[in-house]
Amino acid sequence: MASSSTETQLQRIIRDLQDAATELSHEFKEGGEPITDDSTSLHKFSYKLEYLLQFDQKEKASLLGSKKDYWDYFCACLAKVKGANDGIRFVRSISELRTSLGKGRAFIRYSLVHQRLADTLQQCFMNTKVTSDWYYARSPFLKPKLSSDIVGQLYELTEVQFDLAPRGYDLDAAWPTFARRTLATSTSAYMWKPPSRSSSMSSLVSNYLQTQEMASSLDLNCSLNNEALESFDEMRLELDQLEVREKQLQERVQQLDRENQALRMLVSRQGGQLQVEKEMGYLAVEDSIGLVSLVAELQKQGDVSQATVKKLQSCLQALELNVDKKEYSPSALQLENMAKELDTVRGSLGRENQLLASLSERLARAEKGEKTPPDTELHQEPVPADLVLKFQELKGKLQALEGENTEAQELNRQQSIKLEQLAKELQLKEEARASLAHLVKDVVPLQEELSGKKQESAQLRRQLQESLAHLSSVEEELAEARQQEKQHREEKQLLEQEATSLTWQLQLLETQLGQVSQLVSDLEEQKKQLMQERDHLSQRVGTLEQLAEVHGPPQSAEMPEKRQQCLREEQVNNSTVSEAEQEELQKELQNMVDRNQLLEGKLQALQTDYKALQQREAAIQGSLASLEAEQASIRHLGNQMEASLLAVKKAKETMKAQVAEKEAALQSKESECQRLQEEADQCRLQAEAQAQELRALENQCQQQIQLIEVLSAEKGQQGLSLPQVNTDQLALSQAQLEIHQGEAQRLQNEVVDLQAKLQVALGDRDKLQSQLGVAETVLREHKTLVQQLKEQNEALNRAHVQELLQCSEREGILQEESIYKAQKQEQELRALQAELSQVRCSSEGAHLEHAELQDQLHRANTDTAELGIQVCALTAEKDRMEEALASLAQELQDSKEAALQERKGLELQVMQLQQEKEKLQEKVKAAEEAASSFSGLQAQLAQAEQLAQSLQETAHQEQDALKFQLSAEIMDHQNRLKTANEECGHLRAQLEEQGQQLQMTKEAVQELEITKAAMEEKLNCTSSHLAECQATLLRKDEESTMLQTSLERTQKELEKATSKIQEYYNKLCQEVTNRERNDQKMLADLDDLNRTKKYLEERLIELLRDKDALWQKSDALEFQQKLSAEEKCLGDMEVNHCHDCKREFSWIVRRHHCRICGRIFCYYCCNNYVVTKPSGKKERCCRACFQKFGEGSGSNDSSGSGTSQGEPSPMVSPAEASPQSIGSQGINSVCRPPDDAVFDIITDEELCQIQESGSSLPETPTETDSMDPNTAEQDTTSNSLTPEDTEDVPMGQDAEICLLKSGELMIKLPLTVEEVASFGEGSRELFVRSSTYSLITITVAEPGLTISWVFSSDPKSISFSVVFQETEDTPLDQCKVLIPTTRCNSHKENIRGQLKVRIPGIYLLIFDNTFSRFISKKVLYHLTVDRPVIYDGSDFP
């Protein structure tokens, strides 16, 4: 019944969970907004899921006794899964969570936010081994149907978005029941983002591949993995190079776009300048056209005057006709007078006509640009000076206008040339842009190749994973009891050593606390001393007051009563003020002394801590150097031994070759000796045969000689008796004798030849015998040498074997010692490697930033140079225009002066004409009188008729000229009269204005006279008053001398007192500032020390947990080894067949045992040997163990040869191999993020690697909640994202806003423009604690200002950004980021920058140190404000 009730309850809970999931999906679809903590369905879902996760769970506890929950189950299942462990890393990074239950709840919320809860639970349920280890049989997770139903229902939540706050709730107590306001809906996933360890996708892939490849390559030394590693390294390098090239191309494109925009702006500016210059040229041309039109108008006026002259001539002719018709009544005298007057008039008219003609001719010549011929100039009369000046002025104006026109044309031509050049530059830029487009097109196939490489890398990765899986399966079968016991013993010793080091650090901290208490006591003693000094100063102040009171009474006796009262009041006020000020100063002094004491104590404590840290760092560096030296010496010894072994082998081979050569030479010599002996025997036989023949011939010769003698004797006896009978016989005998003699001679010759041959053969024999003796001696020497070489070889082999044994023993000892030392110093080595990688990354970033700054500076310099050229051109044009304006003004002034001169000349001419008019009127009156007296003069007329007739002809001739001259003069006078009248009008207006001004000046003079009179009266009064004052002054001079002496004395004393007070005040201010700074630094350092202490405590707990887990592993391994030993070690009689070849054992086929696994095999399968111990001894094993050890050690020798010297033993445990792989990974990791941390922590990926490399151990869960501080100190604007988080990243602008909203503010300094303007030349200090940021706000009320800054930081770099806020009430979401957060190398160089104010508001300068968890920064900054220079045209006249 109980079981059925629990099953029904479980089914009801599962149905409720499914209903809650469907309600959440419906709520999201209907509302369209993310689910928050306010949702009741979410509360229901959380409780139901937690109930299922805790249902029928096995009770487990950690080493410290804390209960384990489903969080530890998640860690055990997902610690090795790439991507799924991001949530585990994030939850471990939250320091607020203390219990396993709270961490599990945070992990479920993380999975909901990232929409991967169903995938995570499915991965956990698929690991049936771990699930059965954590849950009993009644759990629904062990039932496939129920677990599949739960996961299938949870997959509906993958499409639902959740907006849950990552922090701010007490998840250890309960689930959240209300929604806390987050930064933004888009930043929720960003806040849930786990700490990243890489800066780009390629580095992320490379780091992951390195973690997989390093373990396999260092543990197993497999050639396949080495090839895969090389290919992966090459692909990673190609990927990095392609990324760098793509970035360079993008930067180049952007730079070319900026240059193109700048050139377009330049072209537009120069086009505007050209337009202005063209307008100027058009104005000059219009002026010249106006002058030409003026000349044309003058010509028209001349034509009009000629027409009027013609009209006057016609009128005169009509008058002459009328005069002819009249009777000749006047007398001859009157006619003569009239003739004289007409002559004078004709002469004047002729002169004027000549002047007009010359002027017209000169004007025509000036227009045509020709000169007057010399013959006409000779006949002309002198022209008046005013007309010459006027003509020269007109000519000069024309020339100036022509010069300006030519200058304008030249400027136009230059501008057109500039435009052509700019057009060419634009064309070049367009061509460059086209080339860039081609380059971009070329990048496309490279990207395709890159994608292909990525696919190949994925295939290689799969192959690598398969090989790793195979290797892990092989490693599980490589366990040996003694070796693993030894490994666990070593690990135990390492853990004990780490525990002792941690206890030693705790003792150091306790000693530091004791030093701090000692410093506090010292500070109290200093406080007492300062109190004594304060008492002494108060006594001195009392003495000064007494002195002031002593000097006071004699002065008061001499002063009048009123002055004495005033002085008493002032003394009372001063005394009260001075007492109050002294009390305040004493209080401030006391406070400052206390604070100074505290700060000095803290400073000394920090200095001692710093010295201790420096000593520790020096000791670590020394130990590291010693370890490196030992490793180098070991490597050197190994190399020497290998070299000596190779040399011995080579010498042995060379000796063998020499022995073979000597043996071949000996054999050849022996064959030669045998051949020579055979030849000598043959020669000996031939000599013996020839000697026998010679003897036989000698016998025959002697016989024949005897016969001859006998015959000769017989012949002599018979010669007497028978001379004739024996003559024939005698001839025959003589012939025979000759024949025999010839044969004997021949035989003698042959004997001589044979003797010579015999001698030669005997010589050859002697030679051969000597050579044979030499060869035998050489052979004996060679045999002895060979024997010696064999003995030496055997001795060398024995010595080499002994050396190898000694080296192997030494190597084993050194390896053990190096392992111990390396494991001791491993953590410090990692820290140093991390710092090295950080310094390298920071140096690379600094180089990149320096290059970018140089490019920006170069572009700014080019822009400023171009602007300077434009400004110079504009100033030159301005100067030219000013000169032109000045010349025009001068010409206008000259024309005005010339007009005045002309006006004067015209006035004179008008006066002359009036006089001539009066004379003509008198003459007309005289003519009328003469006409009245005409009757009396008829006689004279008759006499004068002849003269008149004679003169009439001349008069007719001269009349025409006079008429023309008169008409021209009349028109000229009329024009001059008109101009004179106009100028007179202008002069009248000017005279009226001057009269008004004179009237105003007269009124002002009258007012001044009135004021003068009043001033004279006042002066009289003041003079009388001065006389009285002088009298009083004389009386008071004596008093003032007395007072002055007393004042001087008191002033000196006061100056001394004020100088001392000022000195004390300055010292106090300095001490206040120093103590504030020291307070801030000490608080930050204390905070840092507390954090490190807390971290070390957590690390100690983690190490204890790891130690417990390792003990559990060792116990499980021992148990498994015992079981395997019991299973494998079978009796000899129980096994009847060989395990390898299945051959039946008999009395011929014997049984053999494997020295590793205990299997039994036959004689035919026993030819397998493997090295399993550091001593290098080979042991017989079965075929399966030989294959396992052969693959593990990378040996290809089937005959059982051992591993080479210098390689690690194949039976090294995974726990020993993992630190090496981790260290190498730390060395090879290039893209470690820049960091200020001085600690290095084992990350989760490294723990996963250790677990993968040590997969032969039983899979028991371990708690490794350590977190890498490198990941927590990354920049907020970093683009390093895992592939799962790229879609949850907000815009780059939100990082600064998020910092302002949720970051911890250290200091906020509000400033105004006036305060920045009065900043001074020095720098100010700003303190930024670790994990905080400081803020400088500058309020700007007017646009156009330029704010500049220079800052540096100490001891490390800092991040900087600028944000704009319209008003203080403006929400932070509406702020604008002007300069995004950038990491500046301000600890190496000064960082400069400026900002042009476009909109009035508040500009926030942010110094961000949130990326640094342990190190506080000091920022020295300097601010300036530049106002814009506005040109008001004051340079023009």
Curated annotation (Swiss-Prot):
Subcellular compartments: Cytoplasmic vesicle, Autophagosome; Endosome; Lysosome
Keywords (A to Z) from UniProt: Acetylation, Coiled coil, Cytoplasmic vesicle, Endosome, Lysosome, Metal-binding, Phosphoprotein, Zinc, Zinc-finger
Zinc finger boundaries on the chain: FYVE-type: 1132-1190
Biased composition, class Low complexity, residue ranges: 1194-1206
Modification sites for Phosphoserine: 196, 837
Binding site residues for Zn(2+) 2: 1154, 1157, 1182, 1185
Transmembrane intervals: none
Chain intervals for the UniProt region annotation (Disordered): 1191-1227, 1253-1289
Sections of the chain in a coiled coil: 4-30, 223-270, 305-846, 873-1110
Positions where Phosphothreonine occurs in the chain: 372
The keyword Amino-acid biosynthesis appears for this protein: no
Composition bias, Polar residues: 1218-1227, 1253-1283
One GO term (biological process): plus-end-directed vesicle transport along microtubule
Domain annotation RUN: ranges: 36-169
GO cellular component: autophagosome; Golgi apparatus; late endosome; lysosome
Keyword Nucleotide-binding appears in the UniProt entry: no
Pfam families for this protein: FYVE, RUN
Alphabetical list of SUPFAM superfamilies matching this protein: FYVE/PHD zinc finger, RUN domain-like, Supernatant protein factor (SPF), C-terminal domain
Domain GOLD stretches: 1296-1425
Recorded GO MF terms: zinc ion binding
Matches recorded under InterPro entries: FYVE_FYCO1, GOLD_dom, GOLD_dom_sf, Run_dom, Run_dom_sf, RUN_FYCO1, Znf_FYVE, Znf_FYVE-rel
Residues that bear N-acetylalanine: 2
Role played: May mediate microtubule plus end-directed vesicle transport.
Assembly and oligomerization: Can form homodimers. Interacts (via C-terminus) with MAP1LC3B. Interacts with RAB7A; the interaction with RAB7A induces FYCO1 recruitment to late endosomal/lysosomal compartments.
Protein name: FYVE and coiled-coil domain-containing protein 1
Organism from which the protein derives: Mus musculus (Mouse)
